[in-house]
Protein backbone atom coordinates (compact mmCIF):
# COMPACT_ATOMS: atom_id res chain seq x y z
CA UNK A 1 0.00 0.00 0.00
CA UNK A 2 1.41 3.39 -0.99
CA UNK A 3 1.80 6.27 1.45
CA UNK A 4 -1.13 8.09 -0.17
CA UNK A 5 -3.32 5.01 0.13
CA UNK A 6 -2.32 4.65 3.79
CA UNK A 7 -3.05 8.35 4.33
CA UNK A 8 -6.50 7.93 2.77
CA UNK A 9 -7.19 4.86 4.89
CA UNK A 10 -6.28 6.69 8.10
CA UNK A 11 -8.47 9.61 7.06
CA UNK A 12 -11.54 7.48 6.30
CA UNK A 13 -11.06 5.43 9.47
CA UNK A 14 -11.03 8.66 11.45
CA UNK A 15 -14.11 9.95 9.62
CA UNK A 16 -15.92 6.73 10.51
CA UNK A 17 -14.85 7.14 14.14
CA UNK A 18 -16.20 10.71 14.25
CA UNK A 19 -19.51 9.64 12.70
CA UNK A 20 -19.77 6.90 15.30
CA UNK A 21 -18.96 9.41 18.07
CA UNK A 22 -21.73 11.70 16.85
CA UNK A 23 -24.22 8.83 17.11
CA UNK A 24 -23.78 8.81 20.89
CA UNK A 25 -26.83 9.90 22.90
CA UNK A 26 -24.78 12.89 24.06
CA UNK A 27 -25.45 14.47 20.66
CA UNK A 28 -29.08 13.46 20.14
CA UNK A 29 -30.25 17.11 20.20
CA UNK A 30 -27.19 18.71 18.58
CA UNK A 31 -27.31 20.14 15.07
CA UNK A 32 -24.07 20.33 13.11
CA UNK A 33 -24.09 22.21 9.78
CA UNK A 34 -20.79 20.59 8.83
CA UNK A 35 -19.62 17.05 8.08
CA UNK A 36 -17.29 14.60 9.74
CA UNK A 37 -15.14 14.76 6.62
CA UNK A 38 -14.69 18.51 7.05
CA UNK A 39 -13.78 18.14 10.73
CA UNK A 40 -11.22 15.37 10.24
CA UNK A 41 -9.56 17.22 7.36
CA UNK A 42 -8.87 20.09 9.76
CA UNK A 43 -7.16 17.90 12.37
CA UNK A 44 -3.45 17.29 12.55
CA UNK A 45 -1.81 13.87 12.31
CA UNK A 46 -0.97 13.75 16.01
CA UNK A 47 -4.01 12.84 18.07
CA UNK A 48 -4.09 14.67 21.40
CA UNK A 49 -6.26 13.43 24.26
CA UNK A 50 -7.36 16.43 26.32
CA UNK A 51 -8.02 15.87 30.06
CA UNK A 52 -10.80 18.44 29.88
CA UNK A 53 -12.75 15.95 27.76
CA UNK A 54 -13.03 13.68 30.81
CA UNK A 55 -14.41 16.67 32.70
CA UNK A 56 -16.85 17.52 29.91
CA UNK A 57 -18.25 13.99 29.93
CA UNK A 58 -18.53 14.17 33.71
CA UNK A 59 -20.37 17.49 33.52
CA UNK A 60 -22.78 16.18 30.89
CA UNK A 61 -23.57 13.19 33.11
CA UNK A 62 -24.31 15.49 36.05
CA UNK A 63 -26.66 17.66 33.99
CA UNK A 64 -28.38 14.70 32.33
CA UNK A 65 -29.17 13.30 35.77
CA UNK A 66 -30.32 16.67 37.06
CA UNK A 67 -32.64 17.32 34.14
CA UNK A 68 -34.13 13.85 34.30
CA UNK A 69 -34.77 14.17 38.04
CA UNK A 70 -35.86 17.83 37.82
CA UNK A 71 -32.98 18.81 40.09
CA UNK A 72 -30.11 21.26 39.82
CA UNK A 73 -26.39 21.55 40.36
CA UNK A 74 -25.51 24.90 41.86
CA UNK A 75 -22.18 26.59 42.32
CA UNK A 76 -20.53 29.99 42.31
CA UNK A 77 -17.67 32.00 40.83
CA UNK A 78 -14.34 30.74 42.16
CA UNK A 79 -11.41 33.10 42.68
CA UNK A 80 -8.40 30.95 43.56
CA UNK A 81 -7.00 27.50 44.50
CA UNK A 82 -7.92 27.91 48.17
CA UNK A 83 -11.53 28.47 47.23
CA UNK A 84 -11.67 25.67 44.66
CA UNK A 85 -10.48 23.10 47.22
CA UNK A 86 -13.11 24.16 49.73
CA UNK A 87 -15.90 24.23 47.13
CA UNK A 88 -15.01 20.69 46.06
CA UNK A 89 -16.18 19.28 49.41
CA UNK A 90 -19.75 20.40 48.88
CA UNK A 91 -20.45 21.43 45.26
CA UNK A 92 -20.21 19.33 42.10
CA UNK A 93 -19.23 22.06 39.60
CA UNK A 94 -17.04 25.18 39.58
CA UNK A 95 -17.74 28.46 37.79
CA UNK A 96 -15.16 30.92 36.45
CA UNK A 97 -16.60 34.40 36.00
CA UNK A 98 -15.46 36.93 33.43
CA UNK A 99 -16.62 39.70 35.77
CA UNK A 100 -14.41 38.40 38.58
CA UNK A 101 -11.51 37.84 36.21
CA UNK A 102 -11.88 41.36 34.82
CA UNK A 103 -11.64 42.87 38.30
CA UNK A 104 -9.11 40.52 39.88
CA UNK A 105 -7.19 38.44 37.33
CA UNK A 106 -6.66 40.21 34.00
CA UNK A 107 -3.60 38.90 32.21
CA UNK A 108 -2.41 42.54 32.06
CA UNK A 109 -3.06 42.96 35.82
CA UNK A 110 -5.14 46.05 34.95
CA UNK A 111 -8.50 45.83 36.76
CA UNK A 112 -11.68 46.83 34.97
CA UNK A 113 -15.46 46.56 35.19
CA UNK A 114 -17.11 43.76 33.24
CA UNK A 115 -16.71 45.09 29.71
CA UNK A 116 -14.73 42.11 28.32
CA UNK A 117 -11.95 44.51 27.37
CA UNK A 118 -9.26 42.34 28.94
CA UNK A 119 -7.04 40.09 26.79
CA UNK A 120 -8.80 36.97 25.54
CA UNK A 121 -6.50 34.65 27.50
CA UNK A 122 -7.58 36.14 30.85
CA UNK A 123 -10.39 33.72 31.71
CA UNK A 124 -8.64 30.66 30.20
CA UNK A 125 -5.65 31.53 32.40
CA UNK A 126 -7.88 31.54 35.47
CA UNK A 127 -9.38 28.21 34.41
CA UNK A 128 -5.88 26.79 34.12
CA UNK A 129 -4.97 28.25 37.54
CA UNK A 130 -7.87 26.36 39.13
CA UNK A 131 -7.46 23.22 37.00
CA UNK A 132 -3.82 22.82 37.99
CA UNK A 133 -4.82 23.22 41.63
CA UNK A 134 -7.54 20.59 41.22
CA UNK A 135 -5.05 18.15 39.72
CA UNK A 136 -2.46 18.84 42.42
CA UNK A 137 -4.82 18.40 45.36
CA UNK A 138 -6.21 15.24 43.78
CA UNK A 139 -2.67 13.81 43.55
CA UNK A 140 -1.85 14.91 47.07
CA UNK A 141 -4.98 13.27 48.49
CA UNK A 142 -4.48 10.04 46.56
CA UNK A 143 -0.91 9.72 47.82
CA UNK A 144 -2.08 10.15 51.39
CA UNK A 145 -4.84 7.59 50.98
CA UNK A 146 -2.67 5.01 49.23
CA UNK A 147 0.02 5.25 51.91
CA UNK A 148 -2.54 4.79 54.69
CA UNK A 149 -3.38 1.21 55.75
CA UNK A 150 -6.79 -0.01 54.58
CA UNK A 151 -8.15 -0.29 58.10
CA UNK A 152 -7.25 3.36 58.74
CA UNK A 153 -8.13 4.82 55.35
CA UNK A 154 -11.68 5.73 56.29
CA UNK A 155 -10.18 8.46 58.49
CA UNK A 156 -8.54 10.13 55.49
CA UNK A 157 -10.50 12.65 53.43
CA UNK A 158 -11.81 11.42 50.09
CA UNK A 159 -12.86 14.61 48.29
CA UNK A 160 -13.57 14.70 44.57
CA UNK A 161 -11.36 17.65 43.71
CA UNK A 162 -11.93 17.18 39.98
CA UNK A 163 -15.17 19.13 39.79
CA UNK A 164 -15.99 20.22 36.21
CA UNK A 165 -15.25 23.87 35.45
CA UNK A 166 -17.65 26.04 33.44
CA UNK A 167 -16.19 29.33 32.24
CA UNK A 168 -17.22 32.67 30.78
CA UNK A 169 -16.37 33.19 27.10
CA UNK A 170 -18.09 36.61 27.00
CA UNK A 171 -18.97 37.30 23.34
CA UNK A 172 -16.01 35.34 21.99
CA UNK A 173 -13.60 38.31 21.90
CA UNK A 174 -13.98 38.99 18.18
CA UNK A 175 -15.04 37.24 14.99
CA UNK A 176 -15.56 33.54 14.40
CA UNK A 177 -11.86 32.68 14.25
CA UNK A 178 -11.42 34.44 17.61
CA UNK A 179 -14.27 32.33 19.01
CA UNK A 180 -12.52 29.19 17.78
CA UNK A 181 -9.15 30.23 19.22
CA UNK A 182 -10.78 31.09 22.54
CA UNK A 183 -12.54 27.72 22.58
CA UNK A 184 -9.22 26.00 21.92
CA UNK A 185 -7.65 27.84 24.85
CA UNK A 186 -10.46 26.75 27.16
CA UNK A 187 -10.20 23.10 26.11
CA UNK A 188 -6.43 23.11 26.54
CA UNK A 189 -6.67 24.70 29.98
CA UNK A 190 -9.23 22.45 31.57
CA UNK A 191 -12.73 23.81 30.96
CA UNK A 192 -15.58 21.32 30.77
CA UNK A 193 -18.01 23.91 29.42
CA UNK A 194 -18.16 27.54 28.33
CA UNK A 195 -20.94 30.08 27.89
CA UNK A 196 -21.14 32.73 25.20
CA UNK A 197 -23.60 35.62 25.01
CA UNK A 198 -25.39 37.31 22.13
CA UNK A 199 -24.09 40.82 22.72
CA UNK A 200 -21.89 42.69 20.25
CA UNK A 201 -18.21 42.31 21.19
CA UNK A 202 -17.19 45.98 21.08
CA UNK A 203 -20.00 47.11 23.38
CA UNK A 204 -20.31 44.07 25.65
CA UNK A 205 -21.57 44.86 29.14
CA UNK A 206 -22.19 42.94 32.33
CA UNK A 207 -25.65 41.40 32.04
CA UNK A 208 -26.91 43.77 34.73
CA UNK A 209 -25.63 46.98 33.14
CA UNK A 210 -27.55 49.23 30.75
CA UNK A 211 -26.70 49.92 27.10
CA UNK A 212 -26.52 46.33 25.85
CA UNK A 213 -26.28 45.86 22.09
CA UNK A 214 -27.28 42.53 20.55
CA UNK A 215 -26.04 40.84 17.41
CA UNK A 216 -28.55 39.19 15.04
CA UNK A 217 -29.71 35.68 15.91
CA UNK A 218 -27.84 34.22 12.95
CA UNK A 219 -24.57 35.79 14.08
CA UNK A 220 -24.81 34.24 17.53
CA UNK A 221 -25.70 30.86 16.04
CA UNK A 222 -22.49 31.12 14.03
CA UNK A 223 -20.59 31.60 17.30
CA UNK A 224 -22.18 28.48 18.77
CA UNK A 225 -21.37 26.51 15.63
CA UNK A 226 -17.78 27.78 15.82
CA UNK A 227 -17.48 26.48 19.39
CA UNK A 228 -18.82 23.07 18.43
CA UNK A 229 -16.63 22.86 15.34
CA UNK A 230 -13.48 23.69 17.32
CA UNK A 231 -14.38 21.20 20.04
CA UNK A 232 -15.05 18.55 17.37
CA UNK A 233 -11.69 19.24 15.74
CA UNK A 234 -10.11 18.66 19.15
CA UNK A 235 -12.25 15.59 19.77
CA UNK A 236 -13.88 16.80 22.97
CA UNK A 237 -17.39 16.85 24.42
CA UNK A 238 -17.04 20.47 25.61
CA UNK A 239 -20.42 21.88 26.63
CA UNK A 240 -21.61 25.05 24.86
CA UNK A 241 -23.99 27.27 26.83
CA UNK A 242 -25.90 29.95 24.92
CA UNK A 243 -26.65 33.06 26.93
CA UNK A 244 -29.12 35.64 25.69
CA UNK A 245 -29.14 39.22 26.98
CA UNK A 246 -32.25 40.04 24.97
CA UNK A 247 -34.57 40.33 27.97
CA UNK A 248 -33.20 43.79 28.76
CA UNK A 249 -31.41 44.77 25.54
CA UNK A 250 -32.30 48.08 23.90
CA UNK A 251 -30.17 48.01 20.73
CA UNK A 252 -29.20 45.63 17.91
CA UNK A 253 -26.47 45.93 15.30
CA UNK A 254 -28.44 44.83 12.23
CA UNK A 255 -31.86 43.99 10.79
CA UNK A 256 -30.47 41.20 8.62
CA UNK A 257 -32.21 38.31 10.42
CA UNK A 258 -35.99 38.20 9.96
CA UNK A 259 -36.35 36.46 13.33
CA UNK A 260 -35.33 39.73 14.98
CA UNK A 261 -37.78 41.90 13.03
CA UNK A 262 -40.74 41.73 15.47
CA UNK A 263 -38.57 43.26 18.20
CA UNK A 264 -37.01 46.16 16.28
CA UNK A 265 -38.47 49.60 16.99
CA UNK A 266 -39.34 52.14 14.31
CA UNK A 267 -40.77 55.62 13.94
CA UNK A 268 -44.44 55.95 12.98
CA UNK A 269 -44.31 59.70 12.34
CA UNK A 270 -43.67 60.44 8.63
CA UNK A 271 -43.23 64.17 9.26
CA UNK A 272 -39.86 64.08 11.05
CA UNK A 273 -36.39 63.64 9.63
CA UNK A 274 -34.05 60.84 10.75
CA UNK A 275 -32.63 61.42 14.22
CA UNK A 276 -28.98 61.18 13.22
CA UNK A 277 -29.41 63.75 10.43
CA UNK A 278 -30.99 66.12 12.94
CA UNK A 279 -28.19 65.58 15.47
CA UNK A 280 -25.44 66.13 12.88
CA UNK A 281 -27.04 69.41 11.83
CA UNK A 282 -27.29 70.50 15.47
CA UNK A 283 -23.63 69.69 16.10
CA UNK A 284 -22.61 71.60 12.98
CA UNK A 285 -24.60 74.55 14.31
CA UNK A 286 -22.41 74.51 17.42
CA UNK A 287 -24.81 72.86 19.86
CA UNK A 288 -23.46 70.41 22.43
CA UNK A 289 -24.11 68.69 25.75
CA UNK A 290 -27.50 69.46 27.25
CA UNK A 291 -28.69 71.18 24.07
CA UNK A 292 -28.10 68.05 22.01
CA UNK A 293 -29.81 65.91 24.65
CA UNK A 294 -32.84 68.21 24.58
CA UNK A 295 -33.03 67.95 20.78
CA UNK A 296 -32.88 64.14 20.95
CA UNK A 297 -35.49 64.00 23.72
CA UNK A 298 -37.85 66.18 21.69
CA UNK A 299 -37.37 63.99 18.60
CA UNK A 300 -38.03 60.82 20.57
CA UNK A 301 -41.22 62.32 22.00
CA UNK A 302 -42.51 63.12 18.51
CA UNK A 303 -41.35 59.97 16.70
CA UNK A 304 -44.10 57.63 17.84
CA UNK A 305 -41.60 54.85 18.45
CA UNK A 306 -43.10 51.36 18.58
CA UNK A 307 -42.82 47.85 17.21
CA UNK A 308 -44.32 47.20 13.78
CA UNK A 309 -46.94 44.84 15.22
CA UNK A 310 -48.04 47.56 17.65
CA UNK A 311 -48.19 50.05 14.79
CA UNK A 312 -50.47 47.70 12.85
CA UNK A 313 -52.72 47.10 15.86
CA UNK A 314 -53.02 50.85 16.44
CA UNK A 315 -53.77 51.44 12.75
CA UNK A 316 -56.51 48.80 12.73
CA UNK A 317 -58.03 50.19 15.94
CA UNK A 318 -58.11 53.65 14.34
CA UNK A 319 -59.54 52.37 11.05
CA UNK A 320 -63.19 52.07 9.92
CA UNK A 321 -62.90 48.25 9.78
CA UNK A 322 -66.07 46.71 11.29
CA UNK A 323 -64.54 43.81 13.23
CA UNK A 324 -61.28 45.20 14.54
CA UNK A 325 -60.59 42.38 17.00
CA UNK A 326 -60.88 39.73 14.28
CA UNK A 327 -58.67 41.79 11.95
CA UNK A 328 -55.99 42.12 14.61
CA UNK A 329 -56.06 38.40 15.39
CA UNK A 330 -55.86 37.59 11.68
CA UNK A 331 -52.85 39.85 11.24
CA UNK A 332 -50.98 38.55 14.30
CA UNK A 333 -51.59 34.94 13.26
CA UNK A 334 -50.56 35.39 9.63
CA UNK A 335 -47.52 37.56 10.38
CA UNK A 336 -46.00 35.36 13.09
CA UNK A 337 -42.49 34.33 12.12
CA UNK A 338 -42.51 36.51 9.01
CA UNK A 339 -40.04 39.17 7.95
CA UNK A 340 -40.96 42.82 8.21
CA UNK A 341 -41.41 42.95 4.43
CA UNK A 342 -43.88 40.06 4.56
CA UNK A 343 -45.63 41.51 7.61
CA UNK A 344 -46.10 44.84 5.80
CA UNK A 345 -47.82 43.08 2.90
CA UNK A 346 -50.11 41.15 5.27
CA UNK A 347 -50.94 44.34 7.19
CA UNK A 348 -51.78 46.22 3.98
CA UNK A 349 -54.08 43.43 2.82
CA UNK A 350 -55.96 43.36 6.13
CA UNK A 351 -55.95 47.09 7.00
CA UNK A 352 -56.40 48.23 3.41
CA UNK A 353 -53.53 50.72 3.57
CA UNK A 354 -49.77 50.94 3.99
CA UNK A 355 -48.66 51.28 7.61
CA UNK A 356 -45.93 53.88 7.98
CA UNK A 357 -43.02 52.41 9.92
CA UNK A 358 -39.35 53.39 9.62
CA UNK A 359 -36.72 51.58 11.71
CA UNK A 360 -33.91 53.53 10.02
CA UNK A 361 -35.04 56.92 11.34
CA UNK A 362 -34.38 56.29 15.07
CA UNK A 363 -30.94 54.68 14.63
CA UNK A 364 -28.35 55.84 17.15
CA UNK A 365 -25.28 57.84 16.19
CA UNK A 366 -23.29 54.58 16.35
CA UNK A 367 -25.65 53.12 13.75
CA UNK A 368 -27.50 50.72 16.05
CA UNK A 369 -31.18 49.94 15.66
CA UNK A 370 -33.52 50.39 18.61
CA UNK A 371 -34.77 47.16 20.08
CA UNK A 372 -37.45 46.10 22.54
CA UNK A 373 -36.43 43.10 24.56
CA UNK A 374 -38.41 41.08 27.07
CA UNK A 375 -39.10 37.50 28.05
CA UNK A 376 -40.87 36.59 24.80
CA UNK A 377 -37.99 38.10 22.89
CA UNK A 378 -35.59 35.91 24.88
CA UNK A 379 -37.74 32.84 24.18
CA UNK A 380 -37.63 33.66 20.47
CA UNK A 381 -33.84 33.67 20.59
CA UNK A 382 -33.52 30.63 22.84
CA UNK A 383 -35.67 28.56 20.49
CA UNK A 384 -33.34 29.50 17.63
CA UNK A 385 -30.20 28.71 19.65
CA UNK A 386 -31.39 25.40 21.11
CA UNK A 387 -30.21 23.03 18.33
CA UNK A 388 -26.69 24.41 18.73
CA UNK A 389 -26.44 24.68 22.53
CA UNK A 390 -26.26 22.22 25.41
CA UNK A 391 -27.80 24.69 27.86
CA UNK A 392 -29.53 28.04 27.46
CA UNK A 393 -29.42 30.94 29.89
CA UNK A 394 -31.57 34.05 29.84
CA UNK A 395 -29.97 36.93 31.71
CA UNK A 396 -32.68 38.70 33.72
CA UNK A 397 -33.15 41.85 35.79
CA UNK A 398 -34.68 40.14 38.82
CA UNK A 399 -34.92 36.68 40.40
CA UNK A 400 -38.50 36.32 39.23
CA UNK A 401 -39.90 32.78 39.42
CA UNK A 402 -42.89 33.62 37.19
CA UNK A 403 -40.58 34.99 34.53
CA UNK A 404 -38.28 31.97 34.84
CA UNK A 405 -41.29 29.68 34.38
CA UNK A 406 -42.54 31.69 31.38
CA UNK A 407 -39.12 31.35 29.76
CA UNK A 408 -38.80 27.63 30.54
CA UNK A 409 -42.33 26.90 29.32
CA UNK A 410 -41.74 28.87 26.12
CA UNK A 411 -38.51 27.04 25.31
CA UNK A 412 -39.84 23.62 26.28
CA UNK A 413 -42.96 24.09 24.15
CA UNK A 414 -40.63 23.77 21.16
CA UNK A 415 -37.65 21.90 22.63
CA UNK A 416 -38.92 19.85 25.61
CA UNK A 417 -35.50 18.33 26.35
CA UNK A 418 -33.58 21.61 26.42
CA UNK A 419 -31.53 22.05 29.58
CA UNK A 420 -31.49 25.54 31.06
CA UNK A 421 -29.07 27.54 33.20
CA UNK A 422 -29.82 30.35 35.67
CA UNK A 423 -27.74 33.18 37.09
CA UNK A 424 -28.48 33.58 40.81
CA UNK A 425 -26.87 36.98 40.57
CA UNK A 426 -25.51 39.03 43.48
CA UNK A 427 -26.63 42.03 41.42
CA UNK A 428 -30.13 41.20 42.66
CA UNK A 429 -31.21 42.51 46.06
CA UNK A 430 -32.30 39.16 47.43
CA UNK A 431 -33.77 40.57 50.62
CA UNK A 432 -36.11 42.75 48.57
CA UNK A 433 -36.76 40.07 45.97
CA UNK A 434 -38.22 37.40 48.24
CA UNK A 435 -38.47 36.28 51.88
CA UNK A 436 -35.82 33.92 53.24
CA UNK A 437 -37.99 30.82 53.10
CA UNK A 438 -38.46 31.41 49.36
CA UNK A 439 -34.74 32.10 48.94
CA UNK A 440 -34.05 28.70 50.49
CA UNK A 441 -36.28 26.88 47.99
CA UNK A 442 -35.58 28.99 44.91
CA UNK A 443 -32.88 26.74 43.44
CA UNK A 444 -35.02 23.65 43.95
CA UNK A 445 -38.06 25.29 42.37
CA UNK A 446 -36.03 26.38 39.36
CA UNK A 447 -34.56 22.89 39.07
CA UNK A 448 -38.06 21.49 38.69
CA UNK A 449 -38.52 23.80 35.67
CA UNK A 450 -35.45 22.42 33.91
CA UNK A 451 -32.77 24.82 35.14
CA UNK A 452 -30.29 22.01 35.60
CA UNK A 453 -27.30 24.24 36.35
CA UNK A 454 -27.41 27.38 38.48
CA UNK A 455 -24.70 29.66 39.77
CA UNK A 456 -23.91 32.81 41.74
CA UNK A 457 -21.52 34.56 39.40
CA UNK A 458 -19.65 36.64 41.98
CA UNK A 459 -20.03 34.84 45.30
CA UNK A 460 -16.28 34.26 45.41
CA UNK A 461 -15.69 37.99 45.14
CA UNK A 462 -18.32 38.92 47.72
CA UNK A 463 -17.39 36.29 50.31
CA UNK A 464 -13.73 37.30 50.02
CA UNK A 465 -14.67 40.96 50.43
CA UNK A 466 -16.86 40.20 53.44
CA UNK A 467 -14.32 38.16 55.40
CA UNK A 468 -11.52 40.59 54.46
CA UNK A 469 -13.50 43.59 55.66
CA UNK A 470 -14.69 41.81 58.80
CA UNK A 471 -11.23 40.57 59.75
CA UNK A 472 -9.34 43.76 58.86
CA UNK A 473 -11.74 45.85 60.93
CA UNK A 474 -11.46 43.56 63.96
CA UNK A 475 -7.70 43.10 63.54
CA UNK A 476 -7.17 46.87 63.56
CA UNK A 477 -8.93 47.05 66.93
CA UNK A 478 -8.12 43.73 68.63
CA UNK A 479 -4.83 42.58 67.17
CA UNK A 480 -4.19 38.83 67.31
CA UNK A 481 -7.37 38.20 69.27
CA UNK A 482 -9.27 38.93 66.07
CA UNK A 483 -7.28 36.32 64.14
CA UNK A 484 -7.83 33.70 66.82
CA UNK A 485 -11.55 34.35 67.23
CA UNK A 486 -12.54 35.08 63.64
CA UNK A 487 -10.22 32.79 61.70
CA UNK A 488 -8.16 30.13 63.43
CA UNK A 489 -10.61 28.92 66.06
CA UNK A 490 -13.53 28.67 63.58
CA UNK A 491 -11.21 26.86 61.15
CA UNK A 492 -10.40 24.29 63.82
CA UNK A 493 -14.00 23.99 65.01
CA UNK A 494 -15.27 23.41 61.47
CA UNK A 495 -12.50 21.08 60.38
CA UNK A 496 -11.26 23.39 57.62
CA UNK A 497 -8.17 21.64 56.26
CA UNK A 498 -6.35 24.90 55.51
CA UNK A 499 -5.83 25.43 59.26
CA UNK A 500 -2.81 23.16 58.78
CA UNK A 501 -1.77 25.12 55.75
CA UNK A 502 1.59 23.38 55.25
CA UNK A 503 -0.11 20.03 54.87
CA UNK A 504 -2.88 21.59 52.74
CA UNK A 505 -0.25 23.09 50.43
CA UNK A 506 1.23 19.64 49.80
CA UNK A 507 4.34 19.76 51.99
CA UNK A 508 3.93 16.11 53.05
CA UNK A 509 3.38 15.07 49.44
CA UNK A 510 6.52 16.82 48.26
CA UNK A 511 8.54 15.44 51.19
CA UNK A 512 7.50 11.93 50.22
CA UNK A 513 8.52 12.53 46.60
CA UNK A 514 11.95 13.69 47.75
CA UNK A 515 12.33 10.65 50.00
CA UNK A 516 11.32 8.42 47.09
CA UNK A 517 14.10 9.92 45.01
CA UNK A 518 16.77 9.91 47.74
CA UNK A 519 16.10 6.40 48.96
CA UNK A 520 13.80 7.19 51.85
CA UNK A 521 15.84 9.75 53.78
CA UNK A 522 15.88 13.54 53.48
CA UNK A 523 17.51 15.84 56.00
CA UNK A 524 15.73 18.82 54.42
CA UNK A 525 12.17 17.51 54.66
CA UNK A 526 9.76 20.43 55.07
CA UNK A 527 7.55 18.56 57.52
CA UNK A 528 10.36 17.09 59.60
CA UNK A 529 11.27 17.77 63.21
CA UNK A 530 10.72 21.41 64.11
CA UNK A 531 7.79 22.18 61.85
CA UNK A 532 5.42 24.48 63.74
CA UNK A 533 2.38 22.66 62.39
CA UNK A 534 2.95 20.02 65.10
CA UNK A 535 1.20 22.48 67.42
CA UNK A 536 -2.11 21.55 65.79
CA UNK A 537 -1.85 17.83 66.47
CA UNK A 538 -4.28 16.61 69.06
From Swiss-Prot:
Coiled coil: none annotated. GO terms for molecular function: isocitrate lyase activity; metal ion binding; methylisocitrate lyase activity. Its EC number is 4.1.3.1, 4.1.3.30. Mg(2+) binds at residue 168. Substrate binds at residues 97-99, 207-208, 243, 423-427, 457. Homotetramer. The keyword Signal does not apply. Pathway: Carbohydrate metabolism; glyoxylate cycle; (S)-malate from isocitrate: step 1/2. The active site is at 206 (proton acceptor). One of its GO terms (cellular component) is peroxisome. PROSITE patterns: ISOCITRATE_LYASE (PS00161). It comes from Emericella nidulans (strain FGSC A4 / ATCC 38163 / CBS 112.46 / NRRL 194 / M139) (Aspergillus nidulans). Catalyzes the formation of succinate and glyoxylate from isocitrate, a key step of the glyoxylate cycle, which operates as an anaplerotic route for replenishing the tricarboxylic acid cycle. Required for growth on ethanol or acetate, but dispensable when fermentable carbon sources are available. Also acts on 2-methylisocitrate. Keywords: Glyoxylate bypass, Glyoxysome, Lyase, Magnesium, Metal-binding, Peroxisome, Tricarboxylic acid cycle. The gene is acuD. Its cofactor is Mg(2+). It catalyses: D-threo-isocitrate = glyoxylate + succinate; (2S,3R)-3-hydroxybutane-1,2,3-tricarboxylate = pyruvate + succinate. This is Isocitrate lyase. It is found in: Glyoxysome.
Amino acid sequence: MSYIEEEDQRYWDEVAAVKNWWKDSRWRYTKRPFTAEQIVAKRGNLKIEYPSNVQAKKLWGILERNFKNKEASFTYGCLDPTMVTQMAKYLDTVYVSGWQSSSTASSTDEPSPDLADYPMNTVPNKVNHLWMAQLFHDRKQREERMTTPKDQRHKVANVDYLRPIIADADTGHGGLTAVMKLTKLFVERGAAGIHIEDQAPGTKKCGHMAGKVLVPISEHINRLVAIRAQADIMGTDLLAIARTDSEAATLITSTIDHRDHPFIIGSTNPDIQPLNDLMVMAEQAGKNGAELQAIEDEWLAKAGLKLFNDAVVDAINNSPLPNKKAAIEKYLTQSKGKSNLEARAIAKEIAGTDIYFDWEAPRTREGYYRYQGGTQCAINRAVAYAPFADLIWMESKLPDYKQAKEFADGVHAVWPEQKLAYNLSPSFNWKKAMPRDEQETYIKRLGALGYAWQFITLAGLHTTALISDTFAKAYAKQGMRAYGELVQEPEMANGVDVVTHQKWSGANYVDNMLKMITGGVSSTAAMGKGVTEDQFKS
